[in-house]
């Protein structure tokens, strides 16, 4: 069994946190976020440290309190540092461009894919073959990066497509004559 929930979440300097019932609100230099913890989990704030504990000794409460602790830690990290995912585009003629509030992707289709940038997420295109997705919400940053990757996932023969910067593409050998 994982013991993630037993570790307290330290509040960094420049970050204010308050707990009202089951809701944890965190405010930092990058923004404000809140998270509502499940009823089976108790949360307390004392001396700039948030502690999470299960209310009952049930299997459900045990599993939920580790998750709640990790999500609260992500709140604190998000408002201090933020989260970032880098995507790489590989393939002849495959490129990305930012046009206003939309990300335009040329991925080998007969049309360009236009992806509207959601609120709270910033997308930058340092090069036509690189995309950076950033924000204060870890889940939303990952979801947006996964949606962009989903338009043309990397294929195993030539490796063409959109992939994460640290992703390894398992390559296959082509047909032999």
From Swiss-Prot:
One of its GO terms (biological process) is cytoplasmic translation. One of its GO terms (molecular function) is rRNA binding. InterPro entries: Ribosomal_uL6-like, Ribosomal_uL6-like_a/b-dom_sf, Ribosomal_uL6_a/b-dom, Ribosomal_uL6_bac-type, Ribosomal_uL6_CS. Keywords: Ribonucleoprotein, Ribosomal protein, RNA-binding, rRNA-binding. GO terms for cellular component: cytosolic large ribosomal subunit. The keyword Transmembrane does not apply. The keyword Ribosomal protein applies. Part of the 50S ribosomal subunit. This protein binds to the 23S rRNA, and is important in its secondary structure. It is located near the subunit interface in the base of the L7/L12 stalk, and near the tRNA binding site of the peptidyltransferase center. Belongs to the universal ribosomal protein uL6 family. This is Large ribosomal subunit protein uL6. It comes from Afipia carboxidovorans (strain ATCC 49405 / DSM 1227 / KCTC 32145 / OM5).
